[in-house]
Amino acid sequence: MSRSTKKGPFVHARLLKKIEAMNASGNKEVIKTWSRSSTVFPQMVENTIAVHDGRKHVPVYITEDMVGHKLGEFVPTRTFKGHKDDEKSNKRK
């Protein structure tokens, strides 16, 4: 179920404040955030945001194609290490 249109898209207030301050100063630095549920706004384009994946912050460079999506969509939280090998298939006859 999607968010109500009367509420508008969600973005963490402090994150948006940092982005606007960076755009005004022209400074390009990585911003750390834990807010994976924040929506990517047009003001964030061409900035790098380090999104937390539960263990570390992963840097994500924001492009125009990402506008409207959530920050958490671009950082996977689980690492797939492969299926466990069956011991029967490892034995030679």
UniProtKB/Swiss-Prot annotation:
Keyword terms: Ribonucleoprotein, Ribosomal protein, RNA-binding, rRNA-binding
One Gene Ontology term from the biological process aspect of the record: translation
Keyword Hydrolase: no
Gene3D superfamilies: 30s Ribosomal Protein S19, Chain A
Residues passing through the membrane, by range: none
Classification via InterPro entries: Ribosomal_uS19, Ribosomal_uS19_bac-type, Ribosomal_uS19_CS, Ribosomal_uS19_SF
Domain of life of the source: Bacteria
GO cellular component: cytoplasm; small ribosomal subunit
Pfam families on file: Ribosomal_S19 (PF00203)
Molecular function as annotated in GO: rRNA binding; structural constituent of ribosome
NCBIfam families named among the record's database cross-references: rpsS_bact
Function in brief: Protein S19 forms a complex with S13 that binds strongly to the 16S ribosomal RNA.
Similarity annotation: Belongs to the universal ribosomal protein uS19 family.
Protein name listed in UniProt: Small ribosomal subunit protein uS19
